[in-house]
Amino acid sequence: MCRNNNNKLNLRDLNQSEIQHFIKDLGEKPFRADQICRWVFAQGVSSFDEMTNLSKGLRAKLNELTTLSQATILTSQVSAKGDTIKFLFGLPDGHAVESVLMKHTYGNSVCVSTQVGCRMGCLFCASTINGLVRNLSPGEIYDQVLGIQRETGERVSHIVIMGAGEPLDNFDNVLKFLENIHAEYGLNIGYRHITLSTCGLVPRMQELALRKLPITLAVSLHAPNDDLRDKLVPINRRYKIHQLIEACSNYIEITGRRITFEYALLSGINDSDEHVRQLAALLKNLLCHINLIPVNPVEEKEFIRTPPEKVERFRQYLEKVGLNVTVRRELGGDIDAACGQLRRRYESKN
């Protein structure tokens, strides 16, 4: 179990089973664990005094041995249309991570970060510029959703795990977060309302498939051949495209779930007629959806987004050969909602 610098357990880093064992060791009755889980994960309390159906004695024990340490909102940015709010959360150790609230007609979606920084090195991503600092704990990921609900007063209905970090590089903590956010004692968000994005850690994709969670897996592809993907997405040097596609095929077979392939369009780099033909040939036999993404500009990078008319031609070709494809609706472009940008600007000023 995870402990902080004061050797206290952070209850939001535990799951129900671990809290049950902890409460049993305290000599308390089993139903107390269920009560505590609801306070911690559904109500999102920040103080043990708020757990009003627990005895004062038990609250005192919890205060002595555990913590409800939370990520706190440092700053936020609201898009001109008001449909996107970007939050910067401060962590207890002084680091910061970003989350984004996106308001859709079907509900509110929160994009969470899973690491401080990232070591994947994707060439057009701001999150990876200074490398990986550390993994987030399950509670630190969960706090992003709780904090946004608390700040806005609006229920979160969908989770997108595509903020800073590679989720499958923080596998166990992300799975525990998923368990808690989905649970009845938590926010009870359906697995089919959760999307997890990976740049292609093939062994972890295989492990995830065996869990048979009905989440949506999104694969950051961004290139249709190894030569180009080696440059844009360096993990491809370890797991080549044929290995990635095989892992995707196995994932579909085991889970029965359609995979989303993300393809960030970079002008003059991966958006030619030959690239779209290669992409179509690569994905034509898979149960999949292709999400074309006009890339967000990053100050330290020189990439330019593909012009709209070329994006449309790219989309039309894929559709013509029978593939399911959409162009991602742009939210929050005016507030630099691309991963990592708000954090880096904040840290440069502080």
Curated annotation (Swiss-Prot):
Residue ranges of every copy of the Radical SAM core domain listed in the record: 104-334
Residues that hold S-adenosyl-L-methionine according to the record: 165-166, 197, 220-222, 296
InterPro entries to which the protein is assigned, alphabetical: Aldolase_TIM (IPR013785), Elp3/MiaA/NifB-like_rSAM (IPR006638), Methyltransferase_A (IPR040072), RlmN_N (IPR048641), RNA_MTrfase_RlmN (IPR027492), rRNA_lsu_MTrfase_RlmN/Cfr (IPR004383), rSAM (IPR007197)
Residues at which [4Fe-4S] cluster binds: 118, 122, 125
Compartmental location: Cytoplasm
Active site: 98, 339
Keywords for this protein: 4Fe-4S, Cytoplasm, Disulfide bond, Iron, Iron-sulfur, Metal-binding, Methyltransferase, rRNA processing, S-adenosyl-L-methionine, Transferase, tRNA processing
Cofactors that this protein relies on: [4Fe-4S] cluster
Membrane-spanning parts: none
UniProt catalytic activity: adenosine(2503) in 23S rRNA + 2 reduced [2Fe-2S]-[ferredoxin] + 2 S-adenosyl-L-methionine = 2-methyladenosine(2503) in 23S rRNA + 5'-deoxyadenosine + L-methionine + 2 oxidized [2Fe-2S]-[ferredoxin] + S-adenosyl-L-homocysteine; adenosine(37) in tRNA + 2 reduced [2Fe-2S]-[ferredoxin] + 2 S-adenosyl-L-methionine = 2-methyladenosine(37) in tRNA + 5'-deoxyadenosine + L-methionine + 2 oxidized [2Fe-2S]-[ferredoxin] + S-adenosyl-L-homocysteine
GO MF annotation list: 4 iron, 4 sulfur cluster binding; metal ion binding; rRNA (adenine(2503)-C2-)-methyltransferase activity; rRNA binding; tRNA (adenine(37)-C2)-methyltransferase activity; tRNA binding
Note accompanying the cofactor annotation: Binds 1 [4Fe-4S] cluster. The cluster is coordinated with 3 cysteines and an exchangeable S-adenosyl-L-methionine.
Gene Ontology CC entries for this record: cytoplasm
Disulfide bond keyword on record: yes
Pfam family, one: Radical_SAM
Predominant localisation class: cytoplasm
Domain of life of the organism encoding this protein: Bacteria
PROSITE patterns noted in UniProt: RADICAL_SAM
Annotated family: Belongs to the radical SAM superfamily. RlmN family.
Function: Specifically methylates position 2 of adenine 2503 in 23S rRNA and position 2 of adenine 37 in tRNAs.
Further details from the record: Reaction proceeds by a ping-pong mechanism involving intermediate methylation of a conserved cysteine residue.
Name this polypeptide is given: Probable dual-specificity RNA methyltransferase RlmN
Organism: Desulforamulus reducens (strain ATCC BAA-1160 / DSM 100696 / MI-1)
Upper classification of the organism: Bacteria, Bacillati, Bacillota, Clostridia, Eubacteriales
